[in-house]
Amino acid sequence: MLVISRKINEKIKIGDDIEITIVSVDKNQVKIGIDAPKNIPILRSELIEQITQENKKAAKEVDITVLKNISDIFKGN
């Protein structure tokens, strides 16, 4: 991991298209601004983890009856 010290309004450039700006620094919080092309997803890691957990939970809760009914439709029953 690369660790860089920055002050408010200083920037970090990643490649040609991504720029990170330090917007503010408080006691336990740093606010950053990210300029990147719209086709590059920018997500907080805790949201990715939450979505992953919800998807796993939903997959476990699939009703077997529903799956059988879908299977019957494709079989022509």
Curated annotation (Swiss-Prot):
It is found in: Cytoplasm. One of its GO terms (cellular component) is cytosol. It comes from the Bacteria. Homodimer; the beta-strands of each monomer intercalate to form a hydrophobic core, while the alpha-helices form wings that extend away from the core. Belongs to the CsrA/RsmA family. A translational regulator that binds mRNA to regulate translation initiation and/or mRNA stability. Usually binds in the 5'-UTR at or near the Shine-Dalgarno sequence preventing ribosome-binding, thus repressing translation. Its main target seems to be the major flagellin gene, while its function is anatagonized by FliW. This is Translational regulator CsrA.
